[in-house]
Amino acid sequence: MKLNKYIDHTLLKQDAKKKQIDSLLSEAREYGFASVCVNPTWVEHAKKGLEGTDVKVCTVVGFPLGATTSAVKAFETKEAIQNGADEIDMVINVGALKSGNLALVESDIRAVVEASGDKLVKVIIEACLLTDQEKVVVCQLAQKAGADCVKTSTGFSTGGATIADVTLMRETVGSDMGVKAAGGARSYADALAFVEAGATRIGTSAGVAILKGELADGDY
């Protein structure tokens, strides 16, 4: 198994410096990760830094709270793509889901999907804040709205990916969508377990350590 192709090599910290982003890009080129995931302000820089490789540029929308309006999320998406983003990881409107406003949750996702054109859209459900029933419902809404993938976590809330959540999400969406486990893989064994549970992507800042068989520090 080429585990490197499952990994979105991630640096989303608000205090990330250019030299840290450059290090992320260098590691992505060396290890051939599926993508780098960076904040929107770094998309254009990342695109230039990955020219000549097959590493995708992934960025985040409505991040990390998901509480911006759908119009803002759509604008963020369009601008990110103009700047070179290949993949969009958007955060759902968690408050709307918790309030039972499923129409808003779905239309919010759909706004990003429509703004993305042919680019990959992953929907962050922030599983640590949801009941199992809410996880099932929002995965179904993401599927209905035309998203490509559902993702467990932002890495900025109360918890990251769990095997139970990845399993439930995979069972809910079937084989038609991707499932991204984010914020829970600290070792090669962790990453492998997520893949075996149904993950097609793993979001982590510890991709290099994972591939080296080391135990990584940190929380994403």
From Swiss-Prot:
The keyword Ribonucleoprotein does not apply. Pathway: Carbohydrate degradation; 2-deoxy-D-ribose 1-phosphate degradation; D-glyceraldehyde 3-phosphate and acetaldehyde from 2-deoxy-alpha-D-ribose 1-phosphate: step 2/2. It comes from the Bacteria. It is found in: Cytoplasm. The active site is at residues 89, 151, 180. InterPro entries: Aldolase_TIM (IPR013785), DeoC (IPR011343), DeoC/FbaB/LacD_aldolase (IPR002915), DeoC_typeI (IPR028581). SMART domains: DeoC. Its main location: cytoplasm. One of its GO terms (cellular component) is cytoplasm. The keyword Lyase applies. SUPFAM superfamilies: Aldolase. Keywords: Cytoplasm, Lyase, Schiff base. It catalyses: 2-deoxy-D-ribose 5-phosphate = D-glyceraldehyde 3-phosphate + acetaldehyde. One of its GO terms (molecular function) is deoxyribose-phosphate aldolase activity. Catalyzes a reversible aldol reaction between acetaldehyde and D-glyceraldehyde 3-phosphate to generate 2-deoxy-D-ribose 5-phosphate. NCBIfam families: deoC (TIGR00126). Belongs to the DeoC/FbaB aldolase family. DeoC type 1 subfamily. This is Deoxyribose-phosphate aldolase. The lineage of its organism: Bacteria, Bacillati, Bacillota, Bacilli, Lactobacillales.
